[in-house]
Amino acid sequence: MALPDFTMHQLLEAGVHFGHQTHRWNPKMTPYIYGQRNNIHIIDLAQTVPLLHQALKLVSDTVARGGRILFVGTKRQASEIIADAANRSAQYYVNARWLGGMLTNWKTISNSIHRLRKLDKILAAEAQGFTKKERLNLERDREKLNRALGGIKDMGSVPDLIFVIDTNKENIALQEAKRLGIPVIAIIDTNCDPDDVTHPIPGNDDASRAISLYCDLFARAALDGIARQQGAMGIDLGAQVDAPVEPVLEEVEPVLEESAVLAVSE
């Protein structure tokens, strides 16, 4: 495998360059804003491209050395996409609600995960020895725990790197990661605060197409890391990380200028 590639056309087609209405913005995002059209801020994709590539490489490198990636996205349009990306890349996710202390109080979370595993075991054995009512209660307990912790029940300990969609909604996750010194890759829209993000990627964090593109790229980067790790163990998978595609960077500004005007006017 190789580090996933992407084109400026893909970013524009997914609407990555669309920010929020100009009155809904965070002034700290000024350096990442290209301009505005029809009262909508346009994100500077000339900055998004290299930052996204660097983040993909970081994910691949982290997984290649045995690290864990936690995908976080609990908003409606991100929930299923986040879970799918994490599952197909053998990583972990939180896509329902971030529980306070999920990182900083890992011991308590681990106890809840142990309870979830125990319920899985009991119900897999058809809850022998339990009444129908007791079984229903066990199933409800498992469903509740699985919704909150199912994506991290095999994680083992806190992650080595976190990928976040919507830093405003996942603010508690960011604060816990900062407290523990866990690096964070996050998509930062024009209404976000980039200060607590170690690896910011300016981009639309609301459009489903944009979220799907990000998650697909990061899932493939994690798979590339797995291939590299296995290759280092002597399994020849032909894994190799490609260098950044320079032509993409060269064509960023002219393409952005033309596409931004056309897209916003539609």
UniProtKB/Swiss-Prot annotation:
One of its GO terms (biological process) is translation. One of its GO terms (molecular function) is structural constituent of ribosome. Gene3D superfamilies: Glucose-6-phosphate isomerase like protein, domain 1, Helix hairpin bin. Disulfide bonds: none annotated. Signal peptide: none annotated. One of its GO terms (cellular component) is cytosolic small ribosomal subunit. Pfam families: Ribosomal_S2. The keyword Ribonucleoprotein applies. SUPFAM superfamilies: Ribosomal protein S2. InterPro entries: Ribosomal_uS2 (IPR001865), Ribosomal_uS2_bac/mit/plastid (IPR005706), Ribosomal_uS2_CS (IPR018130), Ribosomal_uS2_flav_dom_sf (IPR023591). Keywords: Ribonucleoprotein, Ribosomal protein. Belongs to the universal ribosomal protein uS2 family. PANTHER family: 30S RIBOSOMAL PROTEIN S2 PROKARYOTIC AND ORGANELLAR, SMALL RIBOSOMAL SUBUNIT PROTEIN US2M. NCBIfam families: rpsB_bact. This is Small ribosomal subunit protein uS2.
